[in-house]
Amino acid sequence: MSLTLHGISVSTGIVIGHAHLLSHTTLEVAHYVMPGHLVHEELARFDAALEQTRQELAGLRSNRPRYAAAEFDAFIDLHLMILADEHINLASRNMIEQEHCNAEWALKMQMDMLVAEFEEFEDPYLRERKTDVVQVVERVLKTLTGQPGHLPITTQPNAKIILVAHDVSPSDLIQLKPHQFAAILTDLGSAISHTAIVARSLSIPCVVGLHRARQSIHENDLLIVDGRRGLVIINPSEASLSEYGLLKTDWEDEQTKLKCLKTTSARTLDGVAVELHANIEFPDDLAEVHESGATGIGLFRSEFLFLNRDVLPDEEEQFVAYRTVAEGMGGLPVTIRTFDLGADKQANNTQRVASNPALGLRAIRLCLAEPKLFRTQLRALLRASHYGNVRILVPMLSSASEINQTLQSITHAKKSLDDDGIAYNHEVQIGGMIEVPAAALTLDVFIKSLDFLSIGTNDLIQYTLAIDRTDDEVAHLYDPLHPAILQLLSHVIGGANKAGIPVSVCGEMAGDAAYTRLLLGLGLRQFSMNPSQLPHVKRCILSTDLPKGAAPMKKILRTHDSLKIRELLDGLNAA
């Protein structure tokens, strides 16, 4: 009997193949109390397991396969850091000594406490890091229980094997890569998990968050994985196999055709040129940027330098990362966003408490509250501007006061470089994110003070509609086509165009081809998105006739019902 599971698509593609279930360590461990004279032996067993796990991880790092993304090292470093954390080792040792319990139980109790703390974080990225804690503890438990430190697998050469697991760590995923599996499915995970990041970097179709895949799928079951929609069909009917066989062929043909658009200029049928830039997370994403045909980087998120570490990056480390990207783009524009971190993401000396980080001390607010931290980044960014076409983008601005303080901070950073005799581009452009409704409604202030604007639709929609899209109870209310959102977008894009200030959209709307003609109709001429989305958006632009869409756009902007707007947009896209 056929069964369909719904999950989260994190890496696209269509695969038809057979299931291979990966065994995993159960975290339901036994609890027993031992005589006092055996505690010393138990501590030695625990220490030995920690050291063996450390050696396994260090070995993976030093022997990183050539196909592994460079950020794989950062993931392994994070797992090594978790392994060395006092909450894992020291607290577990204390529990063994004080309660005379077995090592497995002590470790499991400490893990549960850490996971509970991570669950309290508002920020979805930080909340997802609980998965890394669980993966490290699983690895230690395997050592304690005498299981292999890797996921065993045996596959037939050239077979279409689909891995099904409760969860897979980035290190296990890299180790399994040589087996040439066709897709991966997991019960746990999210679009921002480290496993998802590695899967995308390896171009492996992947669906996570399936919840009961391990329960529902049996060894060697025939599966259809639709990585575009996050669907998994177990034991599909002949009709489904036939349908997806055709869809798979169409998908592969489409990818081939899209690659041919790499060198084609993005221009509408009526001759309007459009800039397509890429969003990146790491310097190592440059290869994907070049492959996509992007004409610049519209958003380089600098947070990767600050997360998952005890010591903040110094100026030199930041400078090297920014310069690498600037030089790698060969003179094309590179827009680097100053760190958009919440107060709950900081290391050591910048830790602060926030009951709701999304609305608290984050992004530019944190930068202005930590001037030394901000000055270090600004100096690194300015130094990098000497090596390429670097622009500095400031997130979460909401008032003239914040703009003035930011520009003053940049002026001070420039003066310090002048005093040190260090070269930089004195005319570097400074831009602001429009992601807070207050910024959109006081647009004139931004236009007068800044060189360019970038609309962050993800946060703008959340803040305007008062929706936390990570909250399952209200996520369905997150609507990019809400009339209020369209009015704000029209106001910002139109106002910037009238003033001659460059404006782009760098949120998810920019990378969704379903919204491309809508944004073009609002006057947008610069999009920034994940590199993999760029060919799809470019294809839509190439088939768009702007004068033909003028009348439907007027109707859309006069409509106050989201469902009706969606109908009108469907008609615009079908034209």
Question: What would you call each of these model-derived segments?
Answer:
Residues 1-328, 334-341, 366, 370, ...:
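Non-catalytic, soluble scaffold/interaction modules
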Residues 254-575:
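Conserved alpha/beta-domain cores
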